[in-house]
Amino acid sequence: GLVSSIGRALGGLLADVVKSKEQPA
């Protein structure tokens, strides 16, 4: 559903932020 799609998108963004903090370019 819409909520799970939004949750998945937010989870992906959060993972990207954490990953970029752990491994700065």
Swiss-Prot record:
Its main location: secreted. It is found in: Secreted. GO terms for biological process: defense response to bacterium. One of its GO terms (cellular component) is extracellular region. InterPro entries: Frog_Litoria. It holds the Pfam family Antimicrobial24. The keyword Secreted applies. Keywords: Amphibian defense peptide, Antibiotic, Antimicrobial, Secreted. Expressed by the skin parotoid and/or rostral glands. Belongs to the frog skin active peptide (FSAP) family. Caerin subfamily. Antimicrobial peptide, that adopts an alpha helical conformation which can disrupt bacterial membranes. Each caerin displays a different antimicrobial specificity. This is Caerin-2.2. It comes from Ranoidea gilleni (Centralian tree frog).
